[in-house]
Design a protein with these regions (language model features):
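Sec-dependent N-terminal signal peptides
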Residues: 12-22
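Surface-exposed loop and turn segments in beta-propeller and other repeat-based domains
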Residues: 34-41, 85-107, 155-172, 214-226, ...
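Residue-level detector of Asp-centered blade-edge/turn motifs that repeat once per structural unit
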Residues: 50-53, 119-120, 184-185, 237-238, ...
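Residue-level marker for isolated small/hydroxyl-bearing positions within beta-strands
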Residues: 60, 127-129, 192, 245, ...
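Short glycine/acidic-enriched loop and turn motifs that connect beta-strands
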Residues: 63-67, 130-135, 195-198, 248-251, ...
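Short loop/turn segments immediately following beta-strands, especially the blade-tip
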Residues: 72-84, 143-153, 201-212, 255-265, ...
Length: 317
């Protein structure tokens, strides 16, 4: 009994220590571990996510400049990207095509970005900034996975066009939707883009389902002073902090929310963490392993021999 009590106390102390670190202003919370180059697998890495147990990793891939694919990796050691092996064994392009009837004349999704899964792995959501229908056409694609966490079994269920109209801006519409996050219970979705530098929230009548009952629920103020080229967003576990990063610089910014998971209460001030020059061309990021690890994707877009193309960077917290 005493040993069990000691273990429980250690877990409590670890959690308290971790949240104390993230609440501080120091930039030393993120320790670089390693980089994995996936240029042989993808010419255009974007979003990244993991299965909760760390045994699978997923990235979105832009092939032939725009066409969208999802590439899945198996990890022999959870959350250790050096052990990641691509699951796809065919030719090029690698990965599972992201396609959906109704996306204009071509049903193949284009310009993919962030990836978010339903917690049980039976649904996956991907943002796109492809204007396939106009006015403005940026959207979140919803896919069902007939086998949980197996991206080769995905089937499109819905293209949810994001309402990004802003009458106070000229031009009035967001031109790129890149970021994506959900409230843990699936009743609220958050998206952000490039042109307006704002984050929008939507209430979902059915958790993790965009097919009906989606209601706009508020919008943040403009974040252009610090986050004017967002690539992804992620909340801390209790929804009182929001992390934002993009490819305008090498920083990650942390904002507070006075009401959990309510983007309209996002603070105007923020804390900055510098991730180093390796993230100069950030394309996406994800916290994983109970918020003890951070993974960042980057691509300089040159497709040359510089070594800066299509990389995944691992950090410990």
């Amino acid at each position: 009994k005493s040993s069990i009590l000691v273990l429980k106390m250690k877990k409590v102390l670890f959690v308290l220590f971790f949240f104390t670190l993230l609440s501080s202003n120091s930039s030393a919370e993120f320790t670089f571990v390693q980089t994995k180059n996936v240029a042989l697998d993808t010419p255009g890495i974007r979003g990244i996510n993991f299965k909760p147990d760390g045994t699978r990793m997923y990235i979105t891939n832009r092939y032939d400049d725009q066409k969208a694919y999802m590439i899945e990796y198996s990890l022999s050691k959870p959350f250790d990207i050096s052990t990641a092996t691509i699951s796809f064994t065919g030719g090029k392009p690698k990965g599972t095509a992201l396609a959906c009837d109704g996306a204009g004349g071509d049903d193949h999704m284009e310009l993919p970005h962030a990836i978010e899964f339903k917690p049980d792995g039976t649904r996956v959501f991907v943002t796109t900034n492809k204007d396939f229908s106009g006015n403005p056409g940026v959207a979140v694609f919803q896919f069902r996975l007939s086998t949980p966490w197996d991206s080769t079994t995905l089937v499109c269920e819905k293209i949810y066009e994001v309402d990004v109209t802003d009458s106070g801006k000229n031009p009035p519409d967001e031109d790129q939707v890149r970021t994506l996050a959900f409230k843990p219970d699936g009743t609220r979705m958050f998206v952000g883009g490039k042109a307006e530098h704002k984050i929008r929230q939507y209430d979902l009548a059915t958790p993790f389902d965009l097919r009906s009952g989606v209601t706009p629920g508020g919008i943040s103020g403009a974040l252009s002073s610090a986050d004017n080229n967002m690539r992804n967003i992620q909340f801390n576990p209790d929804g009182t902090q929001l992390f934002i990063a993009g490819n305008q610089n090498t920083r990650m910014n942390k904002y507070n929310l006075s009401t959990a998971y309510d983007i309209t209460t996002l603070s105007s001030s923020f804390t900055t963490f510098d991730l180093g020059s390796r993230t100069n061309n950030m394309m996406g990021f994800i916290f994983a392993s109970n918020f003890t690890k951070l993974f960042v994707t980057s691509d300089d877009g040159n497709n040359d021999d510089s070594g800066n193309d299509n990389q995944i960077h691992e950090y410990e917290i």
